[in-house]
Regions:
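Active-site donor/metal-binding and catalytic loop motifs
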Residues: 3, 191-206
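Cell-envelope/extracellular polymer assembly enzymes that use nucleotide-activated donors
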Residues: 19, 160, 175
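Long helical/loop segments within the catalytic core of UDP-sugar-dependent glycosyltransferases
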Residues: 38-75, 87-170, 181, 203, ...
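Catalytic donor-sugar/metal-binding loop of nucleotide-sugar-dependent glycosyltransferases
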Residues: 168, 177-195
């Protein structure tokens, strides 16, 4: 979490156009880490909000829905805790939204620790197949493809128009993706824009 928040603070984007939300449903020491990093961002002049939920209703979908209530911007950039975005990534993505029908822009996942173990190498192989082959082919051929839950930007009005984040599914990203595309929102996949992430290094992390 600390690494992600540091990377977000280094994004090359005007502070007055950026709101940072830390959505924390943790039940361990992560809560204290989030509070420390929140204060650092606040002291550095960021528009930042820390939302810690105790009930965890709806899990990730519930956290995203809750965050939407106070999100100020028109575009929502979602990052899971194990991702580390490059500083220029927003400049490579945001201009696609000049098309009013673009509802989502997805980047390809990279792998910080691909060579760590057999498990990480296998995960990387399958994920690369999904991203570099399946997602790319679906996007370029005009077929439906899904937002991968992280490392992408969604237009807030597209989320609202498509019915928002739903709690009655374990794949809230896939669910929203298809509802949005059925509403004729365009999705764009950027195979050449990579957002690095850490793969679970062992079976405990993989679970």
């Amino acid at each position: 979490v600390r690494r992600l928040i540091k990377a977000v603070s280094n994004l090359d984007y005007p502070k007055d156009c950026l709101q940072i939300q830390i959505l924390d449903d943790s039940i361990d020491e992560t809560k204290e880490i989030c509070e420390e990093e929140y204060q650092k961002l606040l002291d550095s002049g960021f528009d930042v909000e820390l939302i810690h939920r105790k009930d965890r209703v709806g899990y990730k979908a519930g956290a995203l829905e809750n965050g939407m209530e106070s999100a100020k911007g028109d575009y929502i950039y979602i990052l899971d805790a194990d991702f580390v975005p490059d500083s220029d990534v927003l400049h490579k993505m945001i201009h696609f939204f000049t098309d009013d029908r673009v509802g989502m822009v997805q980047t390809r996942w990279g792998h910080i620790n691909k060579s760590y173990s057999i498990l990480t190498r296998v995960q990387a192989l399958f994920l690369d197949g999904h991203h570099a082959v399946e997602q790319t082919a679906r996007s370029r051929s005009g077929r439906f493809f899904n937002f991968n839950g992280t490392a992408g930007i969604l237009r807030k009005s597209a989320i609202i128009d498509s019915g928002g984040w739903q709690h009655d599914t374990i794949c809230e990203d896939l669910d929203l993706s298809y509802r949005a595309q059925m509403k004729r929102w365009k999705f764009i996949y950027l195979v050449d824009v990579v957002t690095p992430a850490e793969l679970p290094p062992n079976m405990d992390g993989f679970k």
